[in-house]
UniProtKB/Swiss-Prot annotation:
Source organism per UniProt: Staphylococcus haemolyticus (strain JCSC1435)
Protein name: DEAD-box ATP-dependent RNA helicase CshA
The gene coding this protein: cshA
Subcellular location(s) per record: Cytoplasm
SUPFAM superfamilies linked to this entry: P-loop containing nucleoside triphosphate hydrolases (SSF52540)
SMART domains xref list: DEXDc, HELICc
Length: 503
């Protein structure tokens, strides 16, 4: 298997990729990168989860480093995908002075115009808003040498086929290298290829991650204010060897990590603002079992190749199928079984159905565990830990205290009291998570009115700075090296139980 350096990627970019956890190129990256560096047009038929963003993004960074002005334009069907692609490009280009700007509908155009005036090398946008900027001449095409169409079939389904033609016609074929990626190749896309591309190199690859039968996929319906309680109950009952937890934003990752630490879990967070040195430190801890919970954003976790991840928890539901693919693909590797659980607000069920329709299979509904299940799991865990502690030599002063207590109390009552304290430790620790509204309902008809609308579909609600306190009061002076055990047990959702899951 060729590595990135052998494919022609610079040492600086290879160093960045290694820090991100990318050790070897995926098949589509291995096939596409050499053609991209040679300047050839590429027609990539790739399903989600195959690494296609890296297939065009990694060599693109090599082509724009040291250049000024807009060098590359990337079209995406939705604002969410545009933002995701842009964030990953920023990750690929860390420390290389590459500027990436996003343009899409639903955001003030004046702010985007100011960003374009700063001369970014790469622009990522939705078709409608890109055309707005072309018509205003705030996006100039004279320096663009690379045009990339990501998820072209999805743009076609949303009614953007004419917009795609308009944009491709604005950038003369003789000056541009064109890369088009699509999961399917309907006739309209084939016509587009014949009309606007120059003898493209055809690269096909399939999605290995999503076809992996070793991953059991579940969703659980839960309200935002009950999500953290439910999540920690899952951790208590599942007792994952290694778990990756996905949050939608950097703020969410930071707050989740802090909340888990306050509850006694061994957790660290990863997102785009984490330095490379810190990222490497966190990944080393995770691989060496110094921490067992990694909280991450989608982009920060892409490319991670860590064996032994038994569980993936989507604390925030992913906004598209590709993100879901990458998330759950972190588990169920090397022939091992994995479990993926997605938390979903009742009004977000359209997103679950979209993922199911895209992947051709249904997720199973999973009921949050009852109080008795949680307590039983905690008790079993404490029993195992006590047995392990008994193998260690106790300090003399602790033995003296033990003797004094045994003279005053019955041994059975004394041990029971200590065990109860361990089982219920941290139950009253206060946590704070910023309240985030659920995603907007989807229009599942799959057809947009397209032209000039520029990605207004599937917009997220704006985050509100509401604060949500956990249902606990801080208990001072109580510490334990044990994971936090906390539960409210109010859910009555029907579905599979944990006993069913473990059969």
């Amino acid at each position: 298997m060729q590595n990135f350096k052998e494919l022609g990627i610079s040492d600086k970019t290879v160093e960045t990729l290694e820090a991100m956890g990318f050790k070897e190129p995926t098949p589509i990256q291995k096939d596409s990168i050499p053609y991209t560096l040679e300047g050839k047009d590429i027609l990539g038929q790739a399903q989600t989860g195959t690494g296609k963003t890296g297939a065009f993004g990694i060599p693109l960074i090599e082509k724009v480093v040291g250049q000024s002005g807009v060098q590359a334009l990337i079209l995406a069907p939705t604002r969410e995908l545009a933002m995701q692609v842009a964030e990953q490009l920023r990750e690929f280009s860390r420390g290389q002075n590459v500027q990436v700007v996003t343009v899409f509908g639903g955001m003030p155009i004046d702010r985007q115009i100011k960003a374009l005036k700063r001369g970014p090398q790469i622009v990522v946008g939705t078709p409608g808003r890109v055309i707005d900027h072309l018509n205003r001449r705030t996006l100039k095409t004279n320096g663009i040498h690379t045009l990339i169409l990501d998820e072209a079939d999805e743009m076609m389904n949303m009614g953007f086929i004419d917009d795609m033609r308009f944009i491709m016609d604005k950038i003369p074929a003789e000056q541009r290298q064109t890369m088009l990626f699509s999961a399917t190749m309907p006739k309209a896309i084939q016509t587009l290829v014949q009309q606007f591309m120059k003898s493209p190199q055809i690269v096909k690859t399939m999605n290995n991650e999503m076809s992996d039968p070793q991953i059991d996929e579940y969703y659980t319906i839960v309200k935002e204010l009950e999500k953290f309680d439910t999540f920690t109950n899952f951790l208590d009952v599942h007792q994952p060897e290694l778990a990756i937890v996905f949050g939608r934003t950097k703020r969410r990752v930071d707050e989740l990590t802090s909340a888990l630490l306050s509850k006694g879990y061994k957790a660290e967070g990863l997102h785009g603002d984490i330095t490379q040195a810190k990222r490497l430190e966190v990944l080393k801890k995770f691989k060496n079992d110094q921490i067992d919970i990694l909280v991450a954003t989608d982009v920060a976790a892409r490319g991670l190749d860590i064996s032994g991840v038994s569980h993936v928890y989507n604390f925030d539901i992913p906004q598209d199928t590709e993100s879901y693919t990458h998330r759950i693909g972190r588990t169920g590797r090397a022939g091992k079984e994995g479990i993926a659980v997605t938390f979903v607000n009742p009004i977000e069920m359209d997103y679950i159905r979209q993922i199911e329709d895209s992947n051709g299979r249904r997720m199973n509904a999973l009921r949050p565990p009852h109080r008795k299940e949680v307590l039983k799991a905690r008790e079993d865990d404490i029993k195992d830990k006590v047995k392990n502690w008994m193998s260690r030599e106790s300090e003399a002063r602790l033995k003296r205290i033990s003797s004094e207590l045994l003279e005053e109390y019955d041994s059975t009552e004394l041990v029971a009291s200590l065990l109860q304290e361990l089982v219920e430790a941290n139950d009253e620790v206060e946590v704070q998570l910023t309240f985030e509204k659920p995603l907007a309902r989807k229009n599942r008809q799959g057809k947009g009115n397209g032209s000039r609308r520029g990605g207004k579909r599937n917009n997220k609600f704006d985050n509100k700075n509401k604060r949500s306190k956990g249902n606990f009061n801080k208990k001072k002076g109580k510490k334990t090296d044990r994971r936090e055990r906390q539960d409210k047990g109010r859910s009555t959702m029907k579905g599979r139980t944990f006993a069913d899951l473990q059969k």
